[in-house]
Amino acid sequence: VLIAVGWTLRVAGTVLGLAGAVIFRAGFTSDQLPAGLTQALWWLRLLGSGVALVIGAWVFRAGRDFVVGGKQHTADIIDSFDGLRGTRYLLYLRPFSTDADMASLPSEIAGGGSDENVFFASGLTHEETLVRRFRNFGRVVAIGRPGENLPLPGAARAYLPLDDWQDTVSGLIEGAHVVMLSAGPGPGTVWEFTEALRVLPPTRLVLLAYCDRAAYDRFREAVAEEYARRSRTEPGAPGTGRWPPLPVLPDFPPPFRPERPRWEVWLNGGRSRLRWDFVLKGLVVFGPDWRGDFIRFDPTTLRLPNAVTLRRLVRRELRPVMDQLTRLPTA
């Protein structure tokens, strides 16, 4: 019911908002401007269309929130991890502190743009977008945040106790076709990375950079400390008992063009659009020798960033990653 109501509100808000935007802009064409800007009808039309645009945007956003709420009630929940044995699944690991951001909806289309572009923003949460991108490789599963009332849309959720989770997560990592781990300096995430390093072939690990450079650098430092501690006190890889060498995590790449010429700023309608960045800044994939490669989705490489060129950029940068994952043997 919530999903149906949400879609109804989305459509109604889009129609109302776009109609208001069109009428508002039309009021400023040369043949519509009244002499001296004194005609009451012109002012009423301008006010009414502006109100319609604002109300339409509000209804549209409310509709999207209703859809997300409905998806939470119909989300995929895993009752037992035993059912995953022998199946092909992708394990999505992340700091629980990022759940609110990952469950949010994009407020604009890729690259930003005019106000009415909000009506064309995706109705998928950031986690749903991630799951949709990789779901062809297997079912995407995640550990649910302890204490949450409803699972978030996206990966199928299973729940673990707060004080007894590491052995289960280790088994899930070892059995996963691919592990997608969102970088973050928290102790749980850092332990999960070192555990993936211990039990997983390097080509099965994908490190997601939803964070900025500072958080990524803190993650690298925390990983080095945790690796030093665990490699001294705990057994290494199954079968050999030895820990693989700690991989050198690549630097977070700086923008390709941090400064833009004035003509590009003018052509893009100001600096705000040129400051736009992806929520998923990039990802790190590893070769057989644990050599990491940071693939940055960098909008500054484009002179005219827009929804089409940005989509092509991501698809182009992801192609070698998808090829590597396609070649993986079944776990």
Regions found by a protein language model. Name each.
Residues 7-15, 21-52:
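Hydrophobic alpha-helical transmembrane segments
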Residues 57-157:
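N-terminal topogenic membrane-targeting module
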Residues 91, 178-182, 206:
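Structural motif
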Residues 96-105, 179-189, 212-215:
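Short acidic, S/G/P-rich loop/turn micro-motifs used as interaction or catalytic elements
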Residues 153-176, 186-198:
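TIR-domain catalytic/interaction hotspot
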Residues 185-222:
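Amphipathic helical hotspot of TIR/SEFIR-family domains
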Residues 220-331:
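C-terminal interaction surface of TIR/SEFIR-family domains
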